[in-house]
Amino acid sequence: MTVKKPNEILISRTKRVEDYVLDVIVMFNQGYDEVELKGVGNSIYKAVEVYNQLKDRLGDGIILEKADIGSEVKDRRRISYISIKLKRVY
């Protein structure tokens, strides 16, 4: 099981993309310099969509520091994930 970090947002299918975009902007305003988005399984597309909307809204205010894709074993099944690390630019 993955431990959630304080600057990590786990993307699920229940919230809207706009809500996650607002969550990231609020975290940047609270003083976090880096925020990590993690989409698992069917939520991978939503994590990418959150990044695209953030890039459209903030432009050069954020940079993509790192993006990882892979799979992890959960209950003897492989589940794909994407991890997108964003950094705030001053």
From Swiss-Prot:
Matching SUPFAM superfamilies: AlbA-like
Compartment(s) where it occurs, according to its Swiss-Prot or TrEMBL record: Cytoplasm; Chromosome
Alphabetized UniProt keyword annotations: Chromosome, Cytoplasm, DNA condensation, DNA-binding
Example of a GO MF term: RNA binding
Record bears the keyword Cytoplasm: yes
GO BP of this protein: chromosome condensation
GO annotations of cellular component type: chromosome; cytoplasm
Keyword DNA-binding in annotation: yes
Chief subcellular location: cytoplasm
Highest taxon of source: Archaea
Pfam families noted in UniProt: Alba (PF01918)
Family statement: Belongs to the histone-like Alba family.
Primary role: Binds double-stranded DNA tightly but without sequence specificity. Involved in DNA compaction.
Descriptive protein name: DNA/RNA-binding protein Alba 2
